[in-house]
Design a protein with these regions (language model features):
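Conserved PLP-binding catalytic core of the aspartate aminotransferase-like
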Residues: 167-169, 316, 326-359, 378
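N-terminal secretory signal peptides and thylakoid transit peptides that target proteins
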Residues: 7-35
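N-terminal "arm"/small-domain region of PLP-dependent enzymes with the aminotransferase-like
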Residues: 34, 38-92, 107, 187
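Active-site pre-lysine segment of PLP-dependent enzymes
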Residues: 175-186, 199-222, 226-258
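PLP-dependent aminotransferase class I/II
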Residues: 250-334
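PLP-dependent enzyme catalytic core of the Aspartate aminotransferase-like
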Residues: 355-359, 367-400
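Phosphate-binding glycine-rich loop
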Residues: 90, 100-140, 158
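PLP-dependent aminotransferase-like
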Residues: 135-193
């Protein structure tokens, strides 16, 4: 019995030693990767890197925030400077700058001026559309079961019934299921889809969407929320904008500066669609009365191509770090086309959230029905190296 006990203690010491060695190796591997990534990114492509690009170990008061799909780099230095300068003009309305932004976006999307409306982020666009079409005598909102929640939120606010279509395997959007829900309804249908989808980060191929939109089903409006399109490299993705440019009047595109351009707190977005749709939306908003710093930052951000290149490269490297971690841990995750990733847990998301928060890392909220999955936003490469180390330690400790 004594020999067995000694053997057991020896095993425990060996396992503990192996675990500590694994954690040390992992920390060095991911830490060196984060440092190498930082050095490799095209920082010199612009005059000055964002002030918050350096990494500081998280604390309870200053956690790693990878829960809201924010761009951890912050706005480009030139956009920050423009916003600071605009504060001094805060006693004035930004009428000229708003007109400039409106015109610039119309030129970018090759549409007349009455095809576009500036909004306070894309959320105001969703609200305006639901508010406008809720006045119809019989209307429904059709959405994938697992998607961004603002569509459902505003539908409930305006008493619009919501039809949720179950997802396919690996949380793919069931376009045929959405179509069936529309075909079986004798009123007006609003089809809201996010592409790439949130929280899954996956692309719904253009081939599955365009034919349906082009068929112009009666009493149907398509809302395409492309908040993350700037990150996409998947050849199966194509913006719905080309259908609007071709003259289709049953679809509206929603865009935001919150994600790729790192302007979540500035609240600048826009909608592109046929004049009749844009006019209905205008009646639901307080005009294009955006804040001065936000408008000027948006104008500068659109022209700052070096920073856009840097932002894409940083996001790609952060994605590689997290994917590598998941691969090493054997965790199932979906392919990412955005600035976040969706992976499967071996426990409910609420429990995992608490464990990560105890390590001063904030991760995504629950997304029913995927209650054993977690959405992690992609921070800086240095942040993701830290997160990868923590996940590896948690797995070694048996708590993840």
């Amino acid at each position: 019995m004594h020999v067995v006990q000694v053997h057991s203690n020896t095993n425990r010491r060996t396992k503990m030693s192996n675990s500590l060695a694994l954690r040390r190796r992992t920390f060095l591997n991911f830490g060196l990767l984060g440092a190498a990534v930082s050095a490799a990114l095209p920082v010199k492509a612009f005059a000055q890197a964002p002030a918050n690009v350096s990494f500081i170990a998280p604390t309870a008061d200053n956690p790693i925030r990878i829960n809201f799909n924010e761009n951890a780099l912050g706005m480009s230095p030139s956009a920050q400077a423009a916003a600071r300068d605009a504060v001094a003009k805060g006693n004035r309305y930004a009428k000229a700058e708003i007109t400039q932004l409106h015109t610039k976006l119309c030129d970018m999307y090759n549409v007349p001026k009455n095809f576009l409306l500036l909004t306070d982020g894309s959320s105001e666009g969703i609200r305006a559309l639901l508010g406008a079409y809720s006045r119809l005598p019989k209307v429904q909102l059709v959405i994938p079961e697992l998607t961004y929640g603002d569509g459902e939120h505003f539908a409930n606010l305006y008493n619009v019934p919501v039809v949720k279509v179950p997802m396919l395997a690996d949380w793919k959007v069931d376009v045929a299921g959405l179509k069936k829900a529309v075909d079986g309804f004798d009123g007006f249908s609003i089809v809201y889809f996010v592409n790439p989808n949130n929280p899954t980060s996956t692309v719904t191929p253009a081939s599955e969407i365009e034919l349906w939109v082009k068929s112009k089903p009666d009493n149907t409006l398509f809302i395409a929320d492309e908040a993350y399109a700037e990150y996409v490299s998947d050849p199966n993705f194509k913006s719905i904008a080309n259908l609007i440019q071709d003259g289709l009047d049953n679809v509206v595109l929603l865009k935001t500066f919150s994600k790729f351009y790192a302007m979540a707190g500035m609240r600048v977005g826009f909608a592109v669609g046929a004049p009749a749709i844009i006019k209905m939306m205008k009646d639901q908003v307080a005009g294009e009365k955006l804040n001065y710093p936000g408008v000027t930052a948006a104008l500068v951000s659109l022209d700052d191509e070096p920073f856009q290149e840097y932002s894409r490269a940083s996001n790609l490297e952060s994605r590689k770090i997290l994917a590598s971690c998941f691969d090493k841990l054997g965790a199932k995750y979906l392919p990412s086309s955005t600035n976040f990733m969706f992976f499967e847990l071996n426990e409910p998301i609420h429990a995992f959230q608490k464990k990560m928060a105890a390590r001063n890392i904030l991760v995504g909220r629950p997304f029913p029905p995927a209650m054993n999955w977690c959405r992690i936003s992609l921070g800086t490469p240095q942040e993701m190296a830290y997160v990868a180390n923590e996940l590896t330690k948690m797995r070694a400790e048996g708590v993840f």
